[in-house]
């Protein structure tokens, strides 16, 4: 099993901000109040407005569920017994097969947001995912952390390349579901996604497996917060092959916990009431219509 590389304090702080949004809101409020005291009354309102606008700008880009640039779906309707497990950054031949085995054993369905070049390198896993009743969706071609800030033309090519890989490997039309790398969104990315007719899918429950990959801790975090309608984020892939091997055990514990709670795991399209992949318009027709 691959060892997990220790995270730098700066990166740990970054993930803390991203996945603990209520605490982020509290921290930001304290910053605004501190700015109020520092600026004094004469500059109170201009200073507060500037700080609030800065916070909104950061939130619109960084928060995965933000719909500032493009409509983003983070969960399904409440009140039911369905939830959706989603897996990012795969497929990984050292991890994904074990995850699929756990899903099969528990009669669960899931959605795999794949990196295009990973799918092209391991097409047999993509075909297996679909054959076993799961859904393959788009997580970009190469998962560059800077790609979210590139111009529209570059992002259109990057995303559509992954779309074509999905269609070629699975033999199905694309699901039209896209999850940006690390969940960030920008104006140019939104225009590219909109031109391709994709729906942006985020999540409402994060396993925080990128920070703490212990399967018991991952399952505990998910089961503590999950309710009907939630979309859960996990990772079956990483830049270092095999690093997410704890994912399969976490999936087992999560599925057992869901059963105890009376919840069932379905695909994202099923949770959201979207049509199945075969009912979608082929991607090349959409691309020919681009300006």
Regions found by a protein language model. Give the residues of each.
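N-terminal pre-catalytic segment of deacetylase/amide-hydrolase enzymes
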Residues: 2-85, 93-101, 105, 256, ...
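Acidic-and-aromatic substrate-binding clefts and catalytic sites of carbohydrate-active enzymes
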Residues: 90-94, 114-122, 145-153, 179-186, ...
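CE4/NodB-like, metal-dependent polysaccharide N-deacetylase domain
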Residues: 100-114, 134-135, 151-184, 191-195, ...
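Short, flexible/disordered intra-domain loops and linkers
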Residues: 240-247
